[in-house]
Every structure is written in structure tokens, then in C-alpha cells.
Amino acid sequence: MQPFNVIVISNPVLKAEISPIALNQPQITESSHLLVFASWDKMDNERMEEMYQYIYSQRSLPFDKNMDVMQNLRNLFATFTDEQQYHHSAKQAHIGFGMAIAAAAELGVDATPMEGFDKEALDELLDLPAHGLKSVTLLALGRRDEKTDWLYRLKKVRLPMDRFVISLG
């Protein structure tokens, strides 16, 4: 199941409109591409069935091959509130978000992950509710300007491994 979408924004005018919604962080307007990870607002039967039909058609399998799996998911999500369904979808979007950051690093593209933005205002600007979506995270992509980026020459600081990782043996 892939209960989220990625919206790619390269239009400078639209990025300028997003900037105040995202605390005027310069990466919004300076990026070549801004990705918005937006999760489904709820996990309804229609969306799940459409996704499963697509998966099975791509695998050349009959749709009824694993109906028990789909029914189990329907039963599970039927017990969730709309808010719980959204939170599940948002967690799935975060997994994709992490993969996008790793892919950008592999390609040598600078990436700035962001959660500091007004989600409701961004959703309204991009008309996400009309698509059954809610914004989760932003990922600004591009190449940093080594001359003007004050962080470029500073050491990247992360917790030492022995403080970050808890080993249980």
C-alpha cells in the first residue's frame, strides 16, 4: 500500500507563495524543486481497492488472488478513526520521505527536510483536500551555493554512536 502522493513544485511563483507558509525558510525559494509529501486523509475501501487492482494488474495476477489480505486491511482500517487512518498514512509518507533523502544523497543532490510549515495553509494553497490529501513534510532539493551558505563549511554534528544507538545485544 502506498497511501501518499509526492507533489513536485518547480514554479518559482508558487514557491514564493509557499515561502511565508513555511516560515520564510530560504530553501523553499532557493531550491530547484520542492517536494511535498502528502498522505491520504483516510484509508477508505475505494482507495485500497484501486491500489490493489493496480498492484495485481502490474503483476499480471488475478485480482482475487489474495482477497484475504485486502479483507484483513479493510477490517483493520475500519476500526481506525479518520484521524488514526491519516496518522497511519502520514507514517507511510515519512518512510518515502526518508527514502527520497537517501536517494538525493546518493545522487549528490542537496536536500533539506522540513516540517516547519503551516500544514492547513499549504493544503489550502495546493487544494489538497480536493484530492483527499494532507501535507506531511517538505523536501527542498537542489545544489547549495558554497559561497553564500554559511553552514557549508561548518562541521556536521550528530550524536556519537554510543549515545545514539542503544544496543540490547
Predicted region positions:
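A glycine-rich helix N-cap at a beta->alpha junction
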Residues: 27-32, 36-40, 128-148
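Small-aliphatic-rich amphipathic alpha-helix that forms the alpha element of a beta-alpha
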Residues: 6, 71-125
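C-terminal helix-cap and adjacent tail motif
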Residues: 43, 134-169
